[in-house]
Amino acid sequence: MINRITDNKFKLVSKYQPSGDQPQAIEQLVDNIEGGEKAQILMGATGTGKTYTMSQVISKVNKPTLVIAHNKTLAGQLYGEFKEFFPENAVEYFVSYYDYYQPEAYVPSSDTYIEKDSSVNDEIDKLRHSATSALLERNDVIVVASVSCIYGLGSPKEYADSVVSLRPGLEISRDKLLNDLVDIQFERNDIDFQRGRFRVRGDVVEIFPASRDEHAFRVEFFGDEIDRIREVEALTGQVLGEVDHLAIFPATHFVTNDDHMEVAIAKIQAELEEQLAVFEKEGKLLEAQRLKQRTEYDIEMLREMGYTNGVENYSRHMDGRSEGEPPYTLLDFFPDDFLIMIDESHMTMGQIKGMYNGDRSRKEMLVNYGFRLPSALDNRPLRREEFESHVHQIVYVSATPGDYENEQTETVIEQIIRPTGLLDPEVEVRPTMGQIDDLLGEINARVEKNERTFITTLTKKMAEDLTDYFKEMGIKVKYMHSDIKTLERTEIIRDLRLGVFDVLVGINLLREGIDVPEVSLVAILDADKEGFLRNERGLIQTIGRAARNSEGHVIMYADTVTQSMQRAIDETARRRKIQMAYNEEHGIVPQTIKKEIRDLIAVTKAVSKEEDKEVDINSLNKQERKELVKKLEKQMQEAVEVLDFELAAQIRDMMLEVKALD
């Protein structure tokens, strides 16, 4: 039995006070939520402190909150910020726990079966368990998640019902406790004590919860009664304190009791017989043999161990769901009255919409060729309409809300004023005739002031030709294309900020991690060619790249002004006018953002024995690459420990790149 604490409050800790138009945005959002409004949009310009506004809203409405970002890196940044704002509350992180993931697939054209291959990040697995257990134990919970939160997770009821609840004075034999722990997928290991394991020493049982990484619990028996429970350091055994009540959550999210397991196995066997009959009728004997062999092995594992690799493919039977019924997800672990905030909603909602179809087409291939039972199709992400059915109240957060969000609500709350006083940049349109020489003059003017320039083109060839030309003209320039790996990309951004070069040319400069305060000029070539990066939203986002510098300026090179251009220019001018009026009224002088340039030498460069001499990774031999991977792995763990998930994700990608050279 879990005693859920429902009366605790969110406590926001910050040296800041709401400023600019934050107070009115906070007040409107809170009033609308308390008034029962289902959906609203926070349309906040880049750099206006949207995360702080979100934190203020959470603390005032006091509801469990799910914040969804469109990738792990952004989720990590938000998690770090919310942890700082709410040190006394449960701020949790829920993303895919795979460092590397190759889904199970089959390619009929080459008769290639690709087995599921993955590397699970133990730290992220711990954080996922921490998130689900926190949601069942308390009310003051913020979970920052990627879109993996709409994937199947197992039944929250089974998860909660499987909790082993212990307290001093409870009559339970030691052996009964050991059996209970094994039932919820804990593993006995008296030597290697890790998360999800327990060890036994006489009348003492030590349990290492799946949601912890340093602290375990020591349960001491007197006969068939628990004498006392103490929290201890897992490594040293040092006692940290007495515990009145201990709830041990399952070591896996896919858990079921013996009765339900027998029912599930019977259903799996019945479905197997049905599908074998279909294959035999169609003359697919190879597929029938394959399916029979795989499924019978899985059934044996479920019967003996209560678990098998790929157990999630049988989740429909284990959860007792009907065919086509949506799976349980993280959203089902929240109470009914919870709040959802979608960060960068113009990107995230598109991802939520697209998840189902991609998963379905891959799984259908596996079913058709006898690698999985048809019920595996119900181990899937939610459809968008299924996601919508979970929404009680939602806030879409974006500088450029998408069509979907605008269809959901007419309530749009603006946040335009930046705490730094920075204005949206001035935007002008210049003709394409003589554009390169015109741009060269603008770049030279920026170089003299030690400022940087972004140039965005539409084609790879244009970007390459432009880069070559500017190099001939003596400009320090680099081209960032889609083939550049994380390792090099991180280095390029750092070198741009340090002034190793002055101009960065690219096609898509909207990806995360490309916010550079030193950039005072953004040049948009072919601005009148409508498309993904030249529509209104794309242009506004690109213009925002110059909004972190007090000298920010944008030049669009075009022969005609498209509707998208005009709307982007008008919107930027409207915001700029409001910002200037506010600054004038309050005597604020815009200040360029001062952002520390993180030293990435240790992370991005292989350093030879002569400490200062940097070497190219491609020139390293196999042993040196192996040593570098070890170093990077250590640095990744250090980054995770200090909750710097952005850096950890970068290092992880670098490790994969170094490993790929072998």
Curated annotation (Swiss-Prot):
GO cellular component: cytoplasm; excinuclease repair complex
UniProt cross-references to PROSITE patterns, sorted A to Z: HELICASE_ATP_BIND_1, HELICASE_CTER, UVR
Helicase C-terminal domain: residues covered: 435-601
Binding site for ATP: 44-51
Stretches assigned to the UVR domain: 626-661
GO biological process, one term: nucleotide-excision repair
Record InterPro entries: Helicase/UvrB_N, Helicase_ATP-bd, Helicase_C-like, P-loop_NTPase, UVR_dom, UVR_dom_sf, UvrB, UvrB_inter
GO molecular function: ATP binding; ATP hydrolysis activity; DNA binding; excinuclease ABC activity; helicase activity
UniProt motif Beta-hairpin: location: 97-120
Swiss-Prot/TrEMBL keywords: ATP-binding, Cytoplasm, DNA damage, DNA excision, DNA repair, Excision nuclease, Helicase, Hydrolase, Nucleotide-binding, SOS response
Residue ranges occupied by any Helicase ATP-binding domain in the UniProt entry: 31-188
Domain of life: Bacteria
Chief subcellular location: cytoplasm
The protein's role, per its UniProt record: The UvrABC repair system catalyzes the recognition and processing of DNA lesions. A damage recognition complex composed of 2 UvrA and 2 UvrB subunits scans DNA for abnormalities. Upon binding of the UvrA(2)B(2) complex to a putative damaged site, the DNA wraps around one UvrB monomer. DNA wrap is dependent on ATP binding by UvrB and probably causes local melting of the DNA helix, facilitating insertion of UvrB beta-hairpin between the DNA strands. Then UvrB probes one DNA strand for the presence of a lesion.
PANTHER family xref list: UVRABC SYSTEM PROTEIN B
Oligomeric form and interacting partners: Forms a heterotetramer with UvrA during the search for lesions. Interacts with UvrC in an incision complex.
Domain notes: The beta-hairpin motif is involved in DNA binding.
UniProt family annotation: Belongs to the UvrB family.
The protein, known as: UvrABC system protein B
